[in-house]
């Protein structure tokens, strides 16, 4: 099982959520990166407001930690409406969803995180709600049970997921707007780090922000978490001031290397290179070799390694790329010895 305190884990901790609420941007003009998403939402939101209509239902997907919840809250702020937040696993019964829907006001937003984890029963309730703003509910039990329709105010459903492929086609097709969030480039992450440092009352120069950003795996949540640990280091070692040397020393101490890899990333790549001669190797064999669940490897560890060109998924299995060998200073001949 993956370590719960993995520093570059993109899943939010309680501390992350507390700090994120304080420093996350509130409006699109303050939203850094994801230019393709930002450009589209700068059209869709004013258009809906000008017509006095709710925004079309919005699906946001992408790896964890990229700002799906942040974007949902920005949409609510830009639309000037309330947002009610829940998650797929919390909505166990149809009544749980019905209670939320019936308490929405006109043009409000219902945000469902991890929407791919909705039960089939709850999902069925969503269909008429999304299409016709109607709620079909059963009253009574047995032979006396009857179905009644309740009218709902127009609303926007925003769904967020790390696994868009796990959504059923009927649900996915009901979203009028679909946005994919990509990993951030280092320049945009540097801007985010500098902005967060301001909110944390931390003095950091451009080179220091860049050093934190380049080790943050393209993920704002990780950048902000690393920044808090760098702040701790700087408070003790450099009078609370962060430059490139301070940031590098802090992150080296935390065993986050120049590519943003931690021990789990290195363990995965070393297993493929050392135990399976670079691959191809099946996911189950990799999972057994490093003692990790295949879902964790697939959803948490691999996406960044693949996106950065250190790992390939092929029909025959996983393959470590030339870049992975170069990162560790290993030649392919060495693995054959």
UniProtKB/Swiss-Prot annotation:
InterPro entries: AAA+_ATPase (IPR003593), AAA_lid_4 (IPR041445), DNA_helicase_Holl-junc_RuvB (IPR004605), P-loop_NTPase (IPR027417), RuvB-like_N (IPR008824), RuvB_C (IPR008823), WH-like_DNA-bd_sf (IPR036388), WH_DNA-bd_sf (IPR036390). Its EC number is 3.6.4.-. GO terms for molecular function: ATP binding; ATP hydrolysis activity; four-way junction DNA binding; four-way junction helicase activity. Residues 258-337 are annotated as: Head domain (RuvB-H). It is found in: Cytoplasm. Disulfide bonds: none annotated. It comes from the Bacteria. It is an enzyme of class 3 (hydrolase). Keywords: ATP-binding, Cytoplasm, DNA damage, DNA recombination, DNA repair, DNA-binding, Hydrolase, Nucleotide-binding. Pfam families: AAA_lid_4, RuvB_C, RuvB_N. Residues 4-184 are annotated as: Large ATPase domain (RuvB-L). Residues 185-255 are annotated as: Small ATPAse domain (RuvB-S). GO terms for cellular component: cytoplasm; Holliday junction resolvase complex. ATP binds at residues 23-24, 65, 68-70, 131-133, 174, 184, 221. The RuvA-RuvB-RuvC complex processes Holliday junction (HJ) DNA during genetic recombination and DNA repair, while the RuvA-RuvB complex plays an important role in the rescue of blocked DNA replication forks via replication fork reversal (RFR). RuvA specifically binds to HJ cruciform DNA, conferring on it an open structure. The RuvB hexamer acts as an ATP-dependent pump, pulling dsDNA into and through the RuvAB complex. RuvB forms 2 homohexamers on either side of HJ DNA bound by 1 or 2 RuvA tetramers; 4 subunits per hexamer contact DNA at a time. HAMAP family: DNA_HJ_migration_RuvB (MF_00016). Belongs to the RuvB family. Homohexamer. Forms an RuvA(8)-RuvB(12)-Holliday junction (HJ) complex. HJ DNA is sandwiched between 2 RuvA tetramers; dsDNA enters through RuvA and exits via RuvB. An RuvB hexamer assembles on each DNA strand where it exits the tetramer. Each RuvB hexamer is contacted by two RuvA subunits (via domain III) on 2 adjacent RuvB subunits; this complex drives branch migration. In the full resolvosome a probable DNA-RuvA(4)-RuvB(12)-RuvC(2) complex forms which resolves the HJ. This is Holliday junction branch migration complex subunit RuvB.
């Amino acid at each position: 099982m993956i370590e719960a305190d993995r520093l570059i884990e993109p899943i939010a901790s309680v501390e992350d959520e507390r700090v994120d609420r304080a420093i996350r941007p509130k409006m699109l003009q303050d939203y850094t990166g994801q230019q393709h998403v930002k450009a589209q939402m700068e059209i869709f939101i004013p258009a809906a407001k000008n017509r006095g209509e709710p925004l079309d239902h919005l699906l946001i997907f992408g790896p964890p930690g990229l700002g799906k919840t942040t974007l949902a809250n920005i949409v609510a702020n830009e639309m000037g409406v309330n947002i009610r937040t829940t998650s797929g696993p919390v909505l166990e019964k149809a009544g749980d969803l019905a209670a939320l829907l019936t308490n929405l006001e006109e043009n409000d937003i219902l945000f469902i995180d991890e929407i791919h984890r909705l039960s089939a029963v709850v999902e069925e309730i969503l269909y008429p709600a999304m299409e016709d703003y109607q709620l079909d509910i059963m009253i009574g039990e047995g032979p006396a049970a009857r179905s009644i329709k309740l009218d709902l105010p127009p609303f926007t459903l925003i769904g967020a997921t790390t696994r868009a492929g796990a959504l059923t086609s009927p649900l996915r097709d009901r979203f009028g707007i679909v946005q994919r969030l990509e990993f951030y480039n280092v320049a945009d992450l540097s801007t985010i780090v500098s902005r967060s440092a301001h909110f944390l009352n931390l003095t950091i120069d451009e080179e220091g922000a860049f050093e934190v950003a380049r080790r943050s795996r393209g993920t704002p949540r990780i950048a902000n978490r690393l920044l808090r640990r760098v702040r701790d280091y700087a408070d003790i070692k450099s009078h609370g001031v962060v430059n490139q040397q301070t940031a590098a020393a802090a992150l080296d101490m935390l065993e986050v290397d120049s590519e943003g890899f931690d021990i789990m990333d290195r363990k995965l790549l070393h297993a493929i290179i050392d135990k399976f001669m670079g691959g191809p190797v099946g996911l189950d064999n990799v999972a057994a070799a490093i003692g990790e669940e295949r879902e964790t490897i697939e959803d948490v560890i691999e996406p960044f390694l693949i996106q950065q060109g250190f790992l390939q998924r092929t029909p025959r299995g996983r393959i470590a790329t030339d870049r992975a060998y170069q990162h560790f200073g290993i030649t392919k001949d060495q693995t054959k010895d």
